[in-house]
Swiss-Prot record:
<protein>
    <recommendedName>
        <fullName>UPF0462 protein C4orf33 homolog</fullName>
    </recommendedName>
</protein>
<comment type="similarity">
    <text>Belongs to the UPF0462 family.</text>
</comment>
Length: 199
C-alpha cells in the first residue's frame, strides 16, 4: 500500500519531490517504509539514533497515524532521518496514555534523500483501525513546512488557523484487509487491553 504526501497541511502543492510511504504486512506486524527528501533542517536531535526521542515533532520528521474513528483510539508513529523515533498511543484526541515505545527502525541517508524502515507490531495498533493520515515536517522558524497526505480543504480553513495533525475528521478510510485479504482479522492487543482496564 503506497502513499505520497503531495500537499501542505492547508492544501497547497509541495515544492519538492513528495514524501513516499509504503505499508506492507510482515510477520507479527506491519513494515512502514519511508522515502523522502532530506532537508537537514532543523539539525539532528541530540538523542541517540535508534532510540525514542521526546517531542520529535519539533524536528525533521515523517509521521503516520492509525485511527479507530469510533473509539478515537490511535497510534502515532514519528520517524526522523537521523534515526530517532517516537511512538505514541492515544485514547481521545491528543490524549497520550503511552509514549516512547520501542521500535525497530533503520535509516539510510544521503546528502539530499533518506529512506527509513520501521517494524510496527500488531500490539501497537488499536482494534479495528478504520482511518489513516500521514504527515511530514521540515524547516526552522518561519521556514517551517507542514505537509499532509489528507490536508484540510482550503474552503474549510479559518483565518489564522495553524497546522494541527490531530484533526481526526480529515483522516480518510483505511483497512488492513486491503493488504491482508477480507478474511484477515486484526490480532487483539495486550497493550490496548491494559488501556481499557484503566478507564
Amino acid at each position: 500500500m503506497d502513499f505520497k504526501i503531495e500537499y501542505t497541511w492547508d492544501s497547497f502543492p509541495v515544492s519538492h519531490e513528495p514524501v513516499r510511504i509504503r505499508l506492507n504486512p510482515c510477520d507479527k506486524g506491519l513494515k512502514m517504509e519511508v522515502s523522502a527528501p532530506f532537508f537537514n533542517d532543523p539539525p539532528a536531535p541530540l538523542g541517540e539514533p535508534g532510540k525514542p526521542f521526546s517531542e520529535l515533532w519539533n524536528y525533521e520528521v515523517v509521521e503516520a497515524f492509525f485511527l479507530n474513528n469510533t473509539t478515537e483510539q490511535y497510534l502515532e508513529v514519528e520517524l526522523c532521518p537521523h534515526g530517532q523515533h517516537l511512538v505514541l498511543l492515544l485514547s481521545g484526541r491528543r490524549n497520550v496514555w503511552k509514549k516512547e515505545l520501542a521500535l525497530s527502525f533503520k535509516v539510510s541517508r544521503g546528502e539530499t534523500h533518506w529512506e527509513g524502515e520501521a517494524f510496527l507490531p500488531w500490539s501497537y495498533f488499536p482494534s479495528k483501525v478504520t482511518r489513516f493520515n500521514s504527515f511530514a515536517i521540515h524547516g526552522s522558524n518561519d521556514k517551517r513546512v507542514y505537509e499532509a497526505l489528507y490536508p484540510v480543504p482550503q474552503p474549510e480553513l479559518q483565518q489564522g488557523q495553524n497546522p494541527d495533525f490531530h484533526r481526526l475528521e480529515y483522516f480518510k478510510p483505511f483497512s488492513f484487509n486491503t493488504l491482508l485479504g477480507e478474511e484477515w482479522k486484526q490480532p487483539e492487543s495486550d497493550l490496548w487491553l491494559i488501556e481499557k482496564s484503566d478507564i
